[in-house]
C-alpha cells in the first residue's frame, strides 16, 4: 500500500475455494468485477501507476471519463497506428466504449 498527499493506494488479495474447482476462473473474474465496481462507485481509482491491463481495461472509463478515454485512444492511435503494441491491453475495443 502507498500513502500520498492526494490519498492512499490499497492492495488486496482475494482467496476462495469453491467446492467445484471448475468454476474457479469464473469466481476469480467475479471477484475482480465486484472489487473494481465497488471501488469505482466509491470514487476510487482502479489503475494507479500499474496501468490498466486486460483485467482493468473495461473499468478504465471510471478513472478517465469518456473524454479521457477518447483522448487516450487518440494518443494510442498516434503512437501505434498499426495497433501492434500490446493489442487489447490498454484500451477496450472501440465498440465496447
Model feature map: region roles:
Residues 1-97:
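Conserved glycine-rich FAD pyrophosphate-binding loop
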